[in-house]
Swiss-Prot record:
Residues 131-144, 200-212, 300-310 have a biased composition (Polar residues). Plants silencing APG show enhanced bending of the lamina joints and produce grains increased in size, caused by elongated cells in lemma. Residues 1-40, 61-99, 119-156, 169-242, 256-312, 324-344, 469-505 are annotated as: Disordered. The lineage of its organism: Eukaryota, Viridiplantae, Streptophyta, Embryophyta, Tracheophyta. This is Transcription factor APG. PANTHER family: TRANSCRIPTION FACTOR APG, TRANSCRIPTION FACTOR PIF3. It comes from Oryza sativa subsp. japonica. GO terms for biological process: brassinosteroid mediated signaling pathway; regulation of seed growth. It is found in: Nucleus.
Amino acid sequence: MLRGNDTGSDLAELLWDNGAPAPLRPPPPPPFQPFTCSAAATTSPPAHDYLFIKNLMRGGGAANHHHHDDDDDDDDDVPWLHYHPVVDDDDDADADTAPLPPDYCAALLSGLSDHLPPPAAAASRVDPDPCSSSHGAVVPSTSAAAAKQARTSGGGGGGVMNFTFFSRPLQQRPSGGETASASASAAATSTVPVESTVVQAATNRLRSTPLFSDQRMAWLHPPKPSPRAAAPPPPPPLAPTTRHRLDTAAATATVAQRLPPSEARAPDAPPPAATATATTSSVCSGNGDRRQLNWRDSHNNQSAEWSASQDELDLDDELAGVHRRSAARSSKRSRTAEVHNLSERRRRDRINEKMRALQELIPNCNKIDKASMLEEAIEYLKTLQLQVQMMSMGTGMFVPPMMLPAAAAAMQHHHMQMQQMAGPMAAAAHFPHLGAAAAMGLAGFGMPAAAQFPCPMFPAAPPMSMFAPPPPPPPFPHAAATAVEQTPSPPGAADAGNAPAVKQA
């Protein structure tokens, strides 16, 4: 068995078993070489060493290598380039990697096919003296080891950042006037080379796992533009936009009056260009859509103005309702006052009419105020009551005291005493034909004369005069006879004297 002490010789150990070589263990992993996608940086390994080792591993020996034709060699060159990557169970972190596109290593295949030698040249690399030792050694070159490393790393599929989509920041689709600036920024970004990730080797087999800390840092930070790339032109200045966009012309005019002149904008100004600054795979942008923000602002302002107008309308309605209620209340009060005033006027008119009628009934009444007129009416009523009492006393009919007031009852009692004292002379006051002496006698006792009463006096013989006692005889008979002669006789007395005497039987 041959061992290579030099690490640069890349010797492989082979064990001969009945004329066929069998590998004892896999060769040690070669040092890592950075992966590049360009065809110029790819080293083309000698394909005859690779084919020879493959034939030895199949068990056909060196002699079997000459029996294959050129078509089989072309088919068996690098079949792993067209296979999908194999993802292990423990490589869940690498599950987001995608297979390589078919034309990804087209340049590598074309370079490899140019360096294919004839099959016979592969046998010259075998040691001519296999019997000098129990083991034969095949010395592949460094380029063959690099090809193996590329094959193993390509089969894993997780150690290389395959997509160039993640090597540049995410951009929004340009529209309208943004085509020129977007194309310039895309051209500047495409010149940035793809950064490869670090691949670490396992102990028992070659295994490629990306260091996600470095990969994420490469994704999160935007790539630095090359100094040779042309700087993108500055974005056009943003045209100022109005804060409110209303549908009607009147609302637009109102908003234009409220805004200062510096915030006024052109009628057909294009929308501002939104620059994309996202660097991750998620669709995120540093600057939001300003058109949507403006729409939200205008919508909020319209809602605020609409609510304010609604509040004003409600307040106006409330004020109008209060005015209507107050007007109705005031009109009701005025109508009630008018009715009250009319009734009071009618009542005063009736009172005045009655007072005028009372003034006409009271003689010699020259009072104007109501209190004086009422006093005159009271005195006149008292006089009338006294006259009625005197008339009742003269006719012999007495009114019950209960029907007269207290003053009239006291006066009646006083007159009764006077009548008892005067005797039949008290009745002569009601008869003027009795003579002035009787009237004077009545006046001496404090009785007013009959002429003072406005009521007429009717001469009539009282019913009680027949029961009166005869007058007393005069003190001198001669004078009494003369008085009798002078006294007129009643008209029936003469007829009675001339009447014939009635004969008695």
